[in-house]
């Protein structure tokens, strides 16, 4: 049995079953090589941790109980690697995956680090850069499929501007569409069967990015040649940077059948992209996100796109990874308690007013229904007096989250 499929050596089967906060393969927890491999460098300071090889990252993630590992092409294979070096790296990485049982559910392309992408990749004003970005992405798709990746994420970190005079944003959108249409056809032609997932962000590293929110991408997807192949990869911190309620955007993606992947982390309001440990800051928001994912039956990966504080050593990186998964499972257990709490559920039933006849009239237009509805009378004052009790409901949620429910 593999490291991810077995219970800890000191834990009995009964204890394992009784511990709802222990990660298991069915939870589908994944991390990127760049997350546990982040060395702590920031704009004001150098690295605080040693480099972590891809093989060592796989071993670390297996040790903490993750299901899988994801990567950008150059997280695994350096951009200037020779063919022989690439083959050796791939061979060693595959051996590490086989030894640990970790999966590679998602892959992506780094189109933001190298100076060639300083003014964009697919949206660059330079046709040579746009062509190179396509070539690099096709090769990265080949690499991801070698390891069985099923989802391919696109984050346009340099697809934006600081100087709006430099590029017509309509041209940028058209270029981005052309690139995705091309890559969809490449995936079809190669038999890869990828699901593409587009990841939004309002700014950083560019001053402004062309697709700032998940909603922008949901609208854009419908203009593609193969919209059925393309969904979204919302990230907690990215949407919070825009001042949005993250789980509302996730709900829209779920309702549209477009939540192909999700990036979980946390964020202080009004800050740069912090990539904090999931659930470490926004406790109520994280709870409602997990509740939404679990209640909706979301079947995809729970990917943690975050990193340990730069104060930490490698043991602290393990603490970070364990904390991400543990916090998710704590919120999952709290969601179960919410759904089974008689007082909370009773209050929700009181708040909602069901009227089958009105539902019939309001769902699915017909001239007859419109005529019947236009003749109905409503007591506005009585409707306005309906008691909602949201203060009480919200306090019950707070009590539940703080562990004092029923006291």
Predicted feature locations:
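Short beta-strands and strand-loop turn motifs
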Residues: 69-73, 154-156, 198-201, 232-235, ...
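Glycine/proline-rich, flexible active-site/cofactor-binding loop segments
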Residues: 144, 152-156, 170-204
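Histidine-acidic metal/acid-base catalytic patches
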Residues: 2-67, 78, 91, 98, ...
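Structural motif corresponding to the early beta-alpha repeats
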Residues: 26, 35-37, 63-173
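Functionally constrained cores in energy, signaling, and assembly domains
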Residues: 130, 134-136, 201, 233, ...
């Amino acid at each position: 049995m593999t490291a991810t499929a077995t219970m800890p050596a000191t834990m009995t089967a009964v204890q394992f079953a009784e511990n709802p906060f222990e990660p298991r393969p069915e939870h589908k927890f994944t991390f990127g090589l760049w997350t546990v491999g982040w060395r702590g460098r920031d704009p004001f300071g150098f690295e605080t941790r040693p480099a972590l090889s891809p093989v060592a990252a796989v071993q670390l993630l297996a040790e903490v109980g993750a299901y899988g590992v994801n990567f950008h092409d150059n997280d695994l294979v350096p951009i200037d690697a020779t063919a022989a070096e690439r083959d050796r790296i791939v061979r060693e990485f595959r051996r590490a995956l086989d030894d640990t049982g970790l999966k590679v559910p998602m892959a992506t392309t780094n189109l933001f680090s190298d100076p060639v992408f300083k003014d964009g990749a697919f949206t660059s004003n330079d046709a040579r850069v746009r062509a190179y970005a396509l070539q690099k992405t096709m090769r990265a798709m080949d690499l991801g499929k070698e390891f069985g990746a099923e989802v391919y994420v696109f984050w346009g970190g340099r697809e934006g501007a600081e100087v709006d005079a430099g590029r017509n944003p309509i041209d940028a959108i058209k270029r981005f569409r052309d690139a995705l249409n091309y890559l969809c056809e490449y995936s079809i032609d190669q038999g890869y069967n990828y699901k593409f997932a587009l990841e939004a962000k309002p700014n950083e590293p560019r001053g402004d990015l062309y697709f700032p929110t998940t909603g922008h991408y949901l609208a854009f997807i419908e203009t593609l040649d193969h919209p059925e192949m393309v969904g979204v990869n919302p990230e907690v911190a990215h949407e919070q940077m825009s001042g949005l309620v993250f789980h509302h955007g996730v709900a829209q993606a779920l309702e549209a059948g477009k939540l192909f992947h999700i990036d979980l982390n946390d964020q202080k309001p009004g800050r740069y992209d912090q990539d904090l440990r999931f659930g470490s800051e926004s406790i109520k928001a994280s709870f409602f996100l997990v509740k939404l994912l679990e209640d909706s039956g979301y079947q995809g990966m729970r990917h943690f796109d975050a990193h340990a504080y730069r104060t930490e050593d490698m043991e602290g990186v393990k603490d970070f990874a364990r904390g991400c998964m543990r916090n998710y499972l704590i919120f999952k257990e709290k969601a179960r308690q919410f759904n089974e709490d008689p007082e909370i559920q009773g209050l929700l039933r009181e708040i909602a007013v069901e009227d089958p006849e009105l539902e019939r009239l309001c769902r699915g237009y017909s001239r007859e229904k419109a005529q019947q509805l236009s003749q109905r009378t409503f007591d506005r004052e009585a409707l306005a007096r309906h008691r909602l009790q949201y203060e009480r409901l919200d306090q019950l949620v707070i009590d539940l989250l703080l562990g004092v429910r029923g006291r």
